[in-house]
């Protein structure tokens, strides 16, 4: 008898969990654009931030490359002058 009540309690919990999942899925499906808009907004924001960081990085990269070339040329010409 005790085993039967345990099995029935487990079945009730499973049924309650399944009903909760169905209601949750139904309410999520009621707003079809909600998830899509959040994902789209997040990706757009990430893309904007990446473009901003890249545009801020280019001046630094060019400065480092030009400085490296100037140092290399200075070393080359200073060693020939001596």
Curated annotation (Swiss-Prot):
Range of residues in the leader sequence: 1-29
Cell inner membrane recorded as keyword: no
Cytoplasmic side: 75-82
GO cellular component terms, A-Z: helical viral capsid; host cell membrane; membrane
Source species, domain of life: Viruses
Periplasmic side: 30-54
Keywords from the named record: Capsid protein, Helical capsid protein, Host membrane, Membrane, Signal, Transmembrane, Transmembrane helix, Virion
Residue ranges of the TM segments: 55-74
Family from the record: Belongs to the inovirus capsid protein family.
Function (record text): Self assembles to form a helical capsid wrapping up the viral genomic DNA. The capsid displays a filamentous structure with a length of 760-1950 nm and a width of 6-8 nm. The virion assembly and budding take place at the host inner membrane.
Protein's name in the database: Capsid protein G8P
UniProt source species: Salmonella phage IKe (Bacteriophage IKe)
